[in-house]
Design a protein with these regions (language model features):
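A short loop-to-beta-strand structural motif that recurs across blades of beta-propeller domains
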Residues: 55-57, 96-98, 152-155, 194-196, ...
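Beta-rich, blade/repeat-based domains predominating
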Residues: 24, 30-45, 72-91, 95-96, ...
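A short helix->beta-strand "capping" segment at the edge of beta-propeller domains
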Residues: 16-32, 209
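Beta-propeller domains
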Residues: 46-67
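Short loop/turn segments that connect beta-strands within beta-propeller blades
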Residues: 60-64, 101-105, 158-161, 200-204, ...
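A detector of repeated loop/turn-to-beta-strand junctions in beta-rich toroidal repeat architectures
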Residues: 53, 94, 148-152, 192, ...
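C-terminal outer-membrane/trafficking sorting elements
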Residues: 296-385
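Sec-dependent N-terminal signal peptides
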Residues: 3-12
Length: 385
């Protein structure tokens, strides 16, 4: 059952705070052991890890249900998507970073540095060029196993599979995220509650490491995200700490359970989803979050999620094309039969919307699919009458 909590502001009413006045923190689900790594899957809902149960769950915004998405997940922690929409996950039990391919199987991407096994890859982010950045602290190394590395690193895995050590000076590197323009990288040193920032040079090199902010509370910093304004959201002691791009404290979302991570969700990316304690929460914000699906720049194809209005006999399906191409956009019913073709022809670069009149179909689950040669993606759509 969902619960609502009034947010108690911990600062004076700062005008820069992205938390709206009177905002309510909503508990969506509870009873998990170690929820982590939330990420929004367009057309489906919120994916999140339960490390202790070695399971990835899916929370659905349609009926607020929670179902098993992947089990066993080898104690997955951080989750994100690459630019092809494939799930990227850190697997603590296997001490590696992996990818889930279209058929649902798991493909290991990297598990060693210079022939030595990683400590325990924790959090992960994908840059819009396809490179994967991740942290590798030594907590949660599986029982009976030892650390083979004498440092705890921050790494970059290039789109061609080349692994690069970016930093080896942290005590416990944990949360990791980019600024909206990807010119800054943020990583926190978890047990010290220090957030650092670098300049990203030539897409792959870090420079000018600087302390951005030190959380003034006992505990540890965990997962982090940014919004479109560059504001940083760091889960940590007693709540989600909100900082300006220059490291000025703006506000804190006070939490009834200790938060472990957060991410943006819903079609407009204006809801912050938070894993905390044994539960999942959300809160609506005044700002829009940075997508974690590899589509942050306009150079990629995108088929956007859709939530039909039951009071409207039609619905809009939106998509983006980075280049001119032949585009079939079709709708299928739940057993794969084609219902209608919305687009069939060549379109130039740009953003598009196509209307589908649902008055002639019954309530149920449908799928809309965009095909552009090598790029094919489908989204689920639910018609309610």
């Amino acid at each position: 059952m969902k619960s609502l909590f009034l947010i108690a502001f911990t600062s004076i009413a700062l005008s820069q705070s992205p938390v709206p006045a009177g905002a309510q923190l909503e508990k969506l689900a509870t009873g998990f052991q170690q929820p982590e790594g939330p990420v929004w899957k367009d057309g489906a809902g919120l994916l999140f890890s339960d490390i202790a149960r070695s399971t990835i769950y899916l929370w659905s915004p349609v009926d607020s249900s929670t179902s098993v998405y992947l089990h066993p997940s080898d104690s997955s922690n951080g989750l994100t998507f690459d630019r092809q929409g494939r799930l990227i996950l850190t697997q603590m039990l296997k001490r590696r970073v992996s990818r889930q391919v279209i058929d649902g199987s798991i493909t290991p991407l990297v598990s060693t540095y210079n022939g030595k096994q990683f400590n325990c890859p924790n959090d992960v982010v994908v840059r819009s060029d396809g490179s994967i950045f991740f942290t590798d602290p030594d907590f949660n190394i599986p029982a009976g196993q030892q650390s083979q590395l004498h440092f705890q690193g921050i790494y970059r895995l290039s789109p061609t599979g080349t692994l690069q050590l970016l930093d080896s000076t942290f005590d416990k590197p944990n949360g990791i995220c980019f600024s909206p323009d990807e010119k800054k990288l943020y990583v926190n040193d978890s047990h010290k509650c220090i957030i650092y920032v670098w300049d990203v040079i030539n897409d792959s090199t870090l420079a000018n490491k600087t302390v951005l902010y030190t959380i003034p509370a006992m505990g540890y910093a965990d997962g982090m995200k940014t919004d479109e304004d560059g504001t940083i959201y760091c889960t940590g002691p007693t709540g989600v700490w909100i900082l300006s791009p220059s490291g000025v404290y703006l506000d804190k979302i006070a939490m009834p359970e200790t938060p472990s991570n957060c991410n943006w969700g819903d079609a407009d990316r204006r809801t912050l989803y938070i894993t905390a304690g044994s539960s999942i929460y959300r809160i609506r914000m005044t700002t829009t979050g940075v997508r974690t699906s590899g589509f942050r720049k306009s150079g990629f194809y995108e088929l956007r999620e859709n939530y039909p209005d039951p009071c409207d006999p039609g619905t809009m399906i939106k998509f983006h094309l980075p280049t001119e191409c032949d585009v079939p956009l079709c709708v299928f019913d739940g057993i794969g039969r084609e219902v209608t073709t919305l687009v069939s022809g060549t379109l130039p670069t740009g953003d598009y919307s196509r209307h589908w009149d649902t008055s002639e179909v019954s309530s149920g689950v449908y799928f809309y699919r965009l095909s552009t040669g090598s790029y094919v993606i489908a989204r689920k759509l639910i018609v309610l009458k």
